Regions:
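N-terminal leader segment of winged-helix/HTH proteins
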Residues: 1-26, 75-78
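N-terminal helix-turn-helix DNA-binding core of bacterial DNA-binding proteins
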Residues: 12, 18-62, 88-95
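Short, hydrophobic-biased segments on the C-terminal half of alpha helices
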Residues: 32, 70-71
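Alpha-helical residues within the helix-turn-helix
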Residues: 57, 68, 74-75
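Residues in the helix-turn-helix
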Residues: 65
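Beta-hairpin "wing" of winged helix-turn-helix
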Residues: 74-84, 91
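Short, charged/polar, Gly/Pro-enriched secondary-structure boundary elements
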Residues: 96-100
Length: 108
């Protein structure tokens, strides 16, 4: 790995760890592990993700607060967003999480 790739990787790891280093964002990531635990949706949660309104209801926070939380996770590439009509659905980016899981032992 070149030094510029290493720097990019290190910066991504820092961004990802900062994103999940918050109790509510960590909870969202944990909840999204089991999308079927949320109320049924028109589109299967396992395919498109969980609607933001369901995450908001589980968290008991305002829509704007939950939107900010998932935006941080999305900027860190830890979640994907799928828009269906006016609704945003979120699911974990398992490839990025596997990469993070692979890189952490090299750091710690």
């Amino acid at each position: 790995m070149s030094s510029s790739e290493l720097v990019d990787t290190d910066e991504w790891v820092v961004t990802a760890l900062k994103a999940i280093a918050h109790p509510q964002r960590m909870a969202i990531m944990r909840w999204l592990r089991d999308p079927e635990s949320f109320p049924p949706q028109l589109e299967p949660a396992s395919e498109v993700g969980v609607c933001l309104k369901h995450i908001q209801a589980r968290m008991g926070a305002s829509q704007s607060t939950v939107s900010q939380y998932v935006a941080v996770l999305q900027r860190a590439d830890l979640v994907h967003c799928t828009k269906i009509g006016q609704w945003s659905h979120y699911r974990r980016n398992e490839d990025a999480l596997a990469r993070l899981n692979q890189l952490l032992p090299e750091i710690i």
